Amino acid sequence: DEQEGCASGWVPFDGRCFGFFPQELSWRRAEGFCQRLGARTHLASIHSEEEHQAIMSMLASSQPYSESEEEVADEEVWIGLHRPMGRRHWEWSDGTKMDYSSWYREGFPRRRACAALEDSTDFASWDTELCSDRKPFICEYHV
């Protein structure tokens, strides 16, 4: 069927399903929210330019923000990339390997250990954010 096995409202890509959730949560709470949706559901991991494009177009079609709200809305969107306490390297919350990246800038402020899609570049790049910041997010599961 057309959904390729994804639940209603989720976007299929290459054997996985992506869902955008507009409620604003911290990175950890967003990951927990995704995990409660079902087995092996996590914040989204991105492994190719094509997958990134699919997520960007999903966000473009689902952004609920009107122009007037822009000042108050924190429009970056959490993905599953984080740097766990005491580790030097970035990791995806679903355990997949880091084989693609689209960082907004080089160099990472030490306190910012979670990554979000940057709305100022139409979600084409990632930036580091404080994990406690509350943002909308993308969950993903394998079909």
Curated annotation (Swiss-Prot):
Principal location class: secreted
CDD domains (UniProt xref): CLECT_REG-1_like
Residue ranges occupied by any C-type lectin domain in the UniProt entry: 13-140
Protein name per Swiss-Prot or TrEMBL: Rheacalcin-2
Sample GO molecular function, one term: carbohydrate binding
Disulfide bonds: 6-17, 34-139, 114-131
InterPro entries, per database record: C-type_lectin-like (IPR001304), C-type_lectin-like/link_sf (IPR016186), C-type_lectin/snaclec_domain (IPR050111), CTDL_fold (IPR016187)
